[in-house]
Amino acid sequence: MIAATPMPLLKQPDRLEARLRELPAEPGVYFMRDASDRILYIGKSKKLRSRVRSYFRDLERLNPRINLMVRQVCEIEIIVTDTEAEALALEANLIKQHQPHFNVLLKDDKKYPYLCITWSDDYPRIFITRKRRLGNSRDRYYGPYVDTRLLRHTLFLVKRLFPLRQRPQPLFKDRTCLNYDIGRCPGVCQSLIRPDDYRKTLQKVAMIFQGRSSELVELLEAQMLQAAENLEFEKAAKIRDQIRGLEGLGAEQKVQLPDDRISRDAIALAMDEQHACIQLFQIRAGKLVGRLGFVADAQSGSAAAIAQRVLEEHYASVDSVEIPQEVLVQHDLPEAELLEVWLSERRGRKVEILSPQRQIKADLIAMVERNAEYELARTQQSAERHTASLIDLADLLDLPELPRRIEGYDISHIQGSDAVASQVVFIDGLPAKQHYRRYKIRNPEVRAGHSDDFASLAEVLHRRFRKFAEAKARGESLAPSEQRQGSLLRPDDLADFPDLVMIDGGKGQLSAVVEVLRNLNLLEDVKLCSLAKKREEIFLPGASDPLPTDAEQPGVQLLRRLRDEAHRFAVSFHRQKRTERMRRSRLDDIPGLGHKRQKELLAHFRSIDYLRLATPEQIAEVPGIGAVLAQQIWGYFHPSETA
């Protein structure tokens, strides 16, 4: 018997009221779950009953994002704690573990890079990335940094002060490269340094990005004196050069405070109706050592609430040694005392949160706020350009509304071999890579020597829109108005219905897609166009001639960016599949013949050609190959003689 799908609590008033009455008036953490038992949101409260009830009391006063979340809640779970500070610590850990969608305040903004140290590797790498992956919890990310140039320059100098791994992969299999010869790498590729010793070097480097350069200088000075006492003068000279380099690196910082004994962070933000741009300055030993930048949804709360949440997310992701003695804030935080207690417990020493009104600290906050306003202005200008592109495209294609979600499709193959397709998604004019999809073409007629782009596109569009056709047949709305905003939030339901679909190709490719959508009874629902490469011509369904366009108009340029991205994504997937096929041995197709036995066979016979000429008895002489498997191998190369 199939279990019934749970209904949202808002549609079950009696059950909702009973569940709310069960909640204790004690501190703790609460979980909001949907019909699929996924965690939508994790929160904390001093009084669980009051906080959870507040979500369901008046939905209209909630911001649109939380309103959407509450309408999906089917179950509420709690964990009771002794204190509110314990609840805050538990909430931070649970959010980090589960990453609930509606807890993600900060947008995935690629313009601010991170510095990553892969502690999960035996010999960790250090590199700059614009994507904060969560693949291994042991890897450490610092940032996001506002000044990309300064970050690259700092890493450049660090790699010359300390002997570090310079390459993702070794250049040679059996010898070191030039970096080892000139002293920039300790010979990681040939294991010329023990992993523990290499990690000690990298731990010193990490101190620089933790804002602990002064502490590192003191450590190196002690090591230099010890080396000199031991008559290790060459080692002492190297450490001396490292100290001088670190002092020179610190001298480049422009902002200084007279009090160099206290570590402090200063946070401020600027916001409009849509965007909140947050800047966090890290002051250590009286100098500005780091500028971090964040972008959040302005509708997620007040300026003070957003600042509080940013600080909670930021400090939950850093090591305890990176938490400063003081945190200067632009606005009084709604739960400043609670945050102070939590940070003090994590740091092991007292942390103060201050909202300065005058003198040097107030001037520092004002400077951070000016930088936040500058980033907001840049964000607004970028958003205006993208909006202008969407308006122009809607006018060009005569769309009923702005195409906030656009999907682009392309096919990639070489004469039918390794045929694949790509689906890329632009939301509000920008790539939304979390929604990208890749397809392997399953059509048996599409194979090496037999290509068919029309059939491939037809297959992919059928697979993509089949769920919408089934929903329409059941009488469901493809994009409910109350979920329209959710199309950006929930890619796994019917709310991801596109406003526009673009096909990379001309009239032929577009006609193949039109036929598929007609068969699915979706032709009237899906807005379609195609963009041909040769003359950058735009075609619409049923039109024999391309639209008259100007190649420089914003809407056309947006389609070209979408087309180029779909092409890039398809080609990269095709190359991946082709490389995998080329790396596969012909012996992979023989059942029971694993990688180890394949190596034994090739080592014995030197090549597959010689193996093909061998008798079953000769094959059976190879270690690990019995008579039965030898007969199977011989039969694979001589199918006509075994038939």
UniProtKB/Swiss-Prot annotation:
Coiled coil: none annotated. The keyword Transmembrane does not apply. Gene3D superfamilies: 5' to 3' exonuclease, C-terminal subdomain (1.10.150.20), GIY-YIG endonuclease (3.40.1440.10), UVR domain (4.10.860.10), UvrC, RNAse H endonuclease domain (3.30.420.340). Residues 25-104 form the GIY-YIG domain. GO terms for biological process: nucleotide-excision repair; SOS response. Keywords: Cytoplasm, DNA damage, DNA excision, DNA repair, Excision nuclease, SOS response. Pfam families: GIY-YIG (PF01541), HHH_2 (PF12826), UVR (PF02151), UvrC_RNaseH (PF22920), UvrC_RNaseH_dom (PF08459). One of its GO terms (molecular function) is DNA binding. It is found in: Cytoplasm. Residues 214-249 form the UVR domain. GO terms for cellular component: cytoplasm; excinuclease repair complex. PANTHER family: UVRABC SYSTEM PROTEIN C, UVRC/OXIDOREDUCTASE. Belongs to the UvrC family. Interacts with UvrB in an incision complex. The UvrABC repair system catalyzes the recognition and processing of DNA lesions. UvrC both incises the 5' and 3' sides of the lesion. The N-terminal half is responsible for the 3' incision and the C-terminal half is responsible for the 5' incision. NCBIfam families: PRK00558.1-5, uvrC. This is UvrABC system protein C. It comes from Synechococcus elongatus (strain ATCC 33912 / PCC 7942 / FACHB-805).
